[in-house]
Every structure is written in structure tokens, then in C-alpha cells.
């Protein structure tokens, strides 16, 4: 059957720029998948996605004009139900065949197939392949209905009577199979072969696409539009790099901004603008946020990473003289930067400390009270963490940093740019003469903000960051705000990973259970028997809740370790022991990986699993100790001696943190363990012997599982 390329384009008003890539890919994928399910594609079909500010399109090669005929097998019913004793069709079978429109089919044409204990009747039918027009209509309808759109617009067609629901008003539809228009319709438009190019620079208002394969070429040459998202993105990146090299400056890397700008322009043109150097007195983060968020500009830095008074504009038009475009953008940015300077100057009229009483008026959560209350909890917890880490000045510094950490939430600058919280607090604190350690801790207590972000720079920042994240987790858990599925509105998974990263990467000797217990103590107002911060909101923190929070931490840790390349077995072997000191986990994992390379590893892991199962089934009393006088069989005596020889050294190696040695010493136990299980009956009829052998196995398990539960490594 002959094939041709297929082109589908939806011409619309400007689409949401932050959703364009997702929309374009979804539109193309949904159409291609639907056509494939209807057998209209071929093995040679290749899909090309086009997504520009005003169009979603897909080009598919090798699409059939009609799907091949298909043999369809339908299960009808059991033979016992469909045929009587004489082999004639029953009323039930007649009714079923009539419903399928094949009431005249002969019984001999039906197939009998044994399925389990029942013999079933099947009907084979030849189904004529669907025509492209019908299949494409179904595919386009499904694609429009299933696009990942959070909120649809409702608008009326030209007749003023019919309502249409789509992400933005549509203006046209192309459906071309080779040169032929495919007769489908969507969003109130019948398919044609015409589209529109650039709003201002197209050579003609209406473009005729004479063949599906000529779409991209005609749009670029006649319509002055680059329809492919990736090509536009590459063109913008090249323009940014060229302009940056010419100015001998650096452009800030921002993939999200580059994607957004790519979704805003049809034909990019990179230009350079400037602003008054006087604005550089404002912290550069403020100016950068203004340029990137409000204006979609690319700020330029000098060789030292300092912001300059130059920036790059991505224009959607390419005039012979770009002077007016540059001047217009410079006027706009001047106003924006003046606003930022005003915010900065106005904020500095009040100290951070003077803003603290106002935090009591800011709601943190309607069930948890105000930011002022929260600040008092975080201060108490930060001070405790400081005491756990250092009895010197750290607790007092952590207390002061936590006290000021949220004050910048009340500033005009953070109100305008919430992403600057913490950063502005640091700047304002420095301008007030606050100690540098405290100032940087104000900024750092939000870290890490995202995967791969830097950690707090000082121990003071670490104390406040841990306290802030733990307070968030335990408070929200206490009111039942748990992450579910893909929903995590309070970023609790990110907060947990932040705590985990700080404990591990900063090698902090604080147990996770201790941190959670002390955090729970603060929220229960039971810090060492003293009354904690007063609260107008009850926060019921129960032992079950703290256990649930620990489970949450270990689940996040397991997921993170798997993402880092550790196997499921390696992760389970270590985390099954619930090590409290998370800073030890990388060393334990390294020891487990070294252990698995030993020739004896597989046998020892299997034996450990066997020991674990025996002890579990026997409900062994762990308080029972080994009685050497009751050791009778040569194999059990040999195992006891081998275990005694390595136990002390293995324990000392474990206590020193030499986990590799502690595990590798177990290799000496392979032969005596194998002999024990070959020659000794553990569940002896003699109760004294049985309990003594179980005690020996319990001691063996305790020695083998100090670093990790190696039974988890068994195949």
C-alpha cells in the first residue's frame, strides 16, 4: 500500500511559553501513537515535532492512506453454554452473534480452544483497515482532548453560537497527506493547506503548503518562522554566545529562561542593551532577578562573575536598524531597576530585628500558627543542635541566626521576588553590621534549595538549616500533611533530602533518631523538662508520628542512594539495620561493595539468610547465651572457635569505623558455617542442645550483621 508523509498543524493565538515544549511533544506523541494503534504507520515512520509561539505541528513520514485488513479473534462463550447436546447453537449463542452483526455465521466456522478446564468458542473476523481520514480524525480529537493543559479557555466561533474549549483560540488547521488535504476538522475548522507566517515579517499574509514535506522550508523562507523548537533554541544560544564573546563577557547559564524565550519568539534576533552603572549599587541578585523574571533578558557578568551594566535581548523581529528596539528595552529596564533600587533603599530604613514582632502577623499555616511562632521553635531547635555539635559559641550563634532568618520575608524586595528570601536577609544583615557568620547563615539556612545545590557554608548555617527543615517536616506531619504520589505541595521530600545531604556530606556525628526526638521535644514543649516556646496551636507529636517520620527519611535515603548507582541489595543491606548516624552510610556501602567481591560472599550471604529464617521461626530468646559445655558436635565446636577468633577483632574494626575490614574478616567463617549446616541438626530433640545451637546462630548473626544485613545480598 502506498505511503506519504503526513503533516498536522494547529494554528493558534500565542501559547503559554512555559508549557510549549510539553504541549508540542504531547500533541505529536498522541497523534503518532493513535495512528500506530490504528495500523496507519509503518516501520519507516519517523515523527518530527514543531512547536512555536502560535502553532503545534507534527510531521510523520511513511503514513498509509488505509490500514491493512486485520484478522480479529473474539472470545464468545464456553462451548457448554453456546452449543447444546446435539452441537447446535443455543439461544445464548444466537443472541451473541446477532449483537456482533454476524448472526448467519455457521457453527462450523467457530473455533474451539481449550482454556484451563473449559473449552471456549472463538470467532475469527476479517476487519477492513481504517481509512486515513477516519483514523486521523480520531487521532486529532484524542490529542486535543488529552493535551496536558491545566486550564482551558472557552471562546466562541465566528458564528457567535458555538463554544469551543482549548488552551488558546485556534485560527486554522492543516492536514496534508503528501499533496492531498485530508478531510478532517477540529476546533471549528475544516482542514486545509494554508497557514500564516511571522506576524510582521512574513513575505505574504497566507502561506500555501503544497506538500507535507515542504512545511518547514516554506515557513522559514516565505513565513520567516523557524517552526522547530530545538532549532530556534540553538539559534538563540549561538546568538548569545556570539554577542558574549564580542563583548568579552559571560552570559548567565539559565536553561529554563532559554526555553521560555525560545517559546516567545518565532525568529530570534539577539541584541545588546545597557543601563546606568549607578544601579550596580543594588545587590546583583536583585538586578538579575528583575532582568530575568520580568523582562526575559540575559544579564552579562565580567570575568570575576560580577554583574555588568550590559544585557542581551532576544527580539522577535530583525529590522535593518535595531536602535529603536534596543532603546525601548533600555527604557523599560531602567524603570524596572529603579523599582528594585527603591525597594532596596526602602527596606534598609528598618533593621531586621525591628521586623521580628511583625512575623506574629504572618500566617505560616492555619493549623500551625504564625511565622513568629515558627521562628521561636526553629530558634530553640537550632540552639539544641548547636549544643549537640559544639559547646562553645555555636549554640548562641545558631540562636541569633535563626531569630533573624525569616525577617526578610517582610521586606519589599522579597515580596516582589520571593526567590530572594534568605539572600536579601544576608545583604541587609551585612549592611547593619551583623557578624558575617550570622549573615551568611541567614542565606544558607534555605540550602540545599534543589538537587545538586550547595550546602550551608558554616556550622551556624548548618544548625539553622537542619532546624528549619526538621520543624517543617515534623509540624506538617503532625497535622497529616504527608506527600502522596506525585503531590508534595510543601516540598517535604526535598526538605528530607536536604537534612540527609547535610548529615552525610558534612559528616555530622548526630543520629537521625536524636534529631527527630529533640525536634519532637521542642514541639511538645518538653525540652529537658522546661517549657518550650509558647504556642496557640496544638501540635500532637506522638511516638508513632516520630517513627513515621523516620520511615519517611529512610525511604527518601534509599531512593537517593539508588539514584547514585547503588544496587537495591546494597541499599537494603545497610538500611535494614537503620543506622542512626547517616554520615556512616557511604562507608558502610563501600564496605558492602568490597565484601560482595569476595569469593565467599555469596555463600556467606545465603548462610546468613538461612540463619535469619531459622531464628525467626524458632522465636529464639535473645537473652540466652552460649554454654560451651553443651557444644558436642565437632562442626559446632569448630564454628564456635572460628567465631570467637574473629569476633573481638571484627568488633574493634567496626568501632573504629573500619567497615571494610569488619566485613572481610567474615570470609574465615565460610568453611565452618558450611560444615555446621552439613553436619549439625539445629532443631535437635534435646531442648538444651537446641537452645544452645540457636544461641550460637544468634551470636553468629550479630557478628555478621554489624555493618550490614548481609542476608539481603543473597540471590
UniProtKB/Swiss-Prot annotation:
This is Glycine--tRNA ligase beta subunit. It comes from Nitrosomonas eutropha (strain DSM 101675 / C91 / Nm57). Keywords: Aminoacyl-tRNA synthetase, ATP-binding, Cytoplasm, Ligase, Nucleotide-binding, Protein biosynthesis. GO terms for molecular function: arginine-tRNA ligase activity; ATP binding; glycine-tRNA ligase activity. Pfam families: DALR_1, tRNA_synt_2f. The gene is glyS. PROSITE patterns: AA_TRNA_LIGASE_II_GLYAB (PS50861). Belongs to the class-II aminoacyl-tRNA synthetase family. One of its GO terms (biological process) is glycyl-tRNA aminoacylation. Tetramer of two alpha and two beta subunits. It catalyses: tRNA(Gly) + glycine + ATP = glycyl-tRNA(Gly) + AMP + diphosphate. It is an enzyme of class 6 (ligase). NCBIfam families: glyS (TIGR00211).
Amino acid at each position: 500500500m502506498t505511503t506519504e508523509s503526513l503533516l498536522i498543524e494547529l494554528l493558534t493565538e500565542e501559547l503559554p511559553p512555559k508549557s510549549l515544549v510539553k504541549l508540542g511533544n504531547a500533541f505529536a506523541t498522541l497523534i503518532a501513537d493513535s495512528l500506530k494503534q490504528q495500523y496507519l504507520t509503518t516501520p519507516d515512520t519517523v515523527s518530527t515535532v514543531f512547536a512555536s509561539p502560535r502553532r503545534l505541528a507534527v510531521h510523520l513520514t511513511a503514513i498509509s492512506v488505509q490500514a491493512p485488513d486485520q484478522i480479529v479473534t473474539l472470545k464468545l462463550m464456553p462451548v457448554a453454554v453456546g452449543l447444546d447436546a446435539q452441537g447446535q447453537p443455543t439461544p445464548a449463542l444466537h443472541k451473541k452473534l446477532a449483537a456482533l452483526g454476524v448472526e448467519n455465521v455457521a457453527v462450523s466456522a467457530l473455533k474451539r480452544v481449550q482454556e484451563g478446564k473449559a473449552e471456549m468458542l472463538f470467532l475469527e473476523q476479517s476487519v477492513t483497515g481504517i481509512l486515513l481520514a477516519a483514523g486521523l480524525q480520531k487521532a486529532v480529537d484524542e490529542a486535543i482532548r488529552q493535551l496536558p493543559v491545566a486550564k482551558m479557555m472557552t471562546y466562541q466561533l465566528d458564528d457567535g453560537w458555538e463554544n469551543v474549549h482549548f488552551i488558546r483560540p485556534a485560527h486554522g488547521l492543516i492536514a496534508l497527506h503528501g499533496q492531498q488535504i485530508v478531510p478532517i476538522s477540529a476546533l471549528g475548522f475544516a482542514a486545509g493547506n494554508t497557514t500564516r507566517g511571522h506576524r510582521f515579517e512574513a513575505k505574504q499574509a497566507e502561506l500555501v503548503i503544497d506538500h507535507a514535506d515542504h512545511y518547514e522550508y516554506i515557513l522559514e523562507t516565505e513565513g520567516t518562522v523557524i517552526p522547530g523548537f530545538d532549532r530556534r533554541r540553538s539559534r538563540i544560544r549561538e546568538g548569545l554566545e556570539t554577542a558574549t564573546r564580542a563583548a568579552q563577557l559571560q552570559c548567565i547559564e539559565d536553561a529554563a529562561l532559554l526555553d521560555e524565550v525560545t517559546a516567545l519568539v518565532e525568529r530570534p534576533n539577539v541584541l545588546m542593551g545597557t543601563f546606568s552603572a549607578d544601579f550596580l549599587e543594588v545587590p546583583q541578585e536583585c538586578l538579575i532577578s528583575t532582568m530575568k523574571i520580568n523582562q526575559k533578558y540575559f544579564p552579562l557578568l565580567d570575568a570575576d562573575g560580577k554583574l555588568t551594566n550590559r544585557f542581551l535581548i532576544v527580539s522577535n523581529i530583525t529590522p535593518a536598524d535595531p536602535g529603536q528596539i534596543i532603546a525601548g528595552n533600555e527604557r523599560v529596564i531602567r524603570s524596572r531597576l529603579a523599582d528594585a533600587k527603591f525597594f532596596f533603599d526602602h527596606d534598609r530604613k528598618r533593621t531586621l530585628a525591628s521586623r521580628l514582632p511583625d512575623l506574629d502577623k504572618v500566617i505560616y499555616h492555619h493549623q500551625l500558627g504564625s511565622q513568629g511562632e515558627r521562628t521561636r521553635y526553629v530558634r530553640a531547635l537550632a540552639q539544641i543542635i548547636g549544643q549537640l555539635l559544639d559547646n562553645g559559641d555555636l549554640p548562641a550563634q545558631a540562636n541569633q541566626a535563626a531569630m533573624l532568618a525569616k525577617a526578610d520575608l517582610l521586606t519589599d524586595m522579597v515580596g516582589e521576588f520571593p526567590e530572594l528570601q534568605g539572600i536579601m536577609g544576608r545583604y541587609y544583615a551585612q549592611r547593619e553590621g551583623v557578624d558575617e557568620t550570622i549573615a551568611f547563615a541567614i542565606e544558607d539556612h534555605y540550602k540545599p534549595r534543589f538537587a545538586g545545590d550547595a550546602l550551608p557554608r558554616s556550622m551556624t548555617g548548618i544548625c539553622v538549616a537542619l532546624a528549619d527543615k526538621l520543624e517543617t517536616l515534623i509540624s506538617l506531619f503532625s497535622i497529616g500533611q504527608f506527600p502522596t504520589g506525585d503531590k508534595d505541595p510543601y516540598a517535604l521530600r526535598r526538605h528530607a533530602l536536604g537534612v540527609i545531604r547535610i548529615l552525610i556530606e558534612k559528616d555530622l556525628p548526630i543520629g537521625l533518631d536524636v534529631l527527630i526526638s529533640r525536634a519532637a521535644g521542642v514541639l511538645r514543649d518538653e525540652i529537658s523538662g522546661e517549657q518550650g516556646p509558647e504556642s496557640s496551636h496544638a501540635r500532637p507529636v506522638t511516638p508513632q508520628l516520630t517513627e513515621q517520620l523516620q520511615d519517611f527519611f529512610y525511604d527518601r535515603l534509599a531512593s537517593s542512594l539508588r539514584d547514585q548507582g547503588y544496587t537495591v541489595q546494597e541499599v537494603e543491606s545497610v538500611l535494614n539495620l537503620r543506622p542512626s548516624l547517616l554520615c556512616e552510610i557511604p562507608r558502610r556501602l563501600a564496605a558492602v561493595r568490597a565484601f560482595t567481591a569476595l569469593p565467599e560472599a555469596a555463600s556467606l550471604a545465603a548462610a546468613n539468610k538461612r540463619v535469619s529464617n531459622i531464628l525467626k521461626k524458632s522465636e529464639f530468646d535473645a537473652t540466652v547465651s552460649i554454654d560451651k559445655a553443651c557444644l558436642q558436635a565437632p562442626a559446632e565446636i569448630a564454628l564456635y572457635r572460628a567465631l570467637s577468633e574473629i569476633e573481638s577483632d571484627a568488633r574493634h574494626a567496626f568501632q573504629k569505623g573500619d567497615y571494610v575490614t569488619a566485613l572481610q574478616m567474615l570470609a574465615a567463617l565460610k568453611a565452618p558455617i558450611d560444615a555446621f549446616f552439613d553436619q549439625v541438626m539445629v532443631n535437635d530433640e534435646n531442648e538444651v542442645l537446641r537452645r544452645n545451637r540457636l544461641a550460637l546462630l544468634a551470636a553468629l548473626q550479630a557478628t555478621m550483621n554489624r555493618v550490614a544485613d548481609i542476608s539481603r545480598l543473597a540471590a
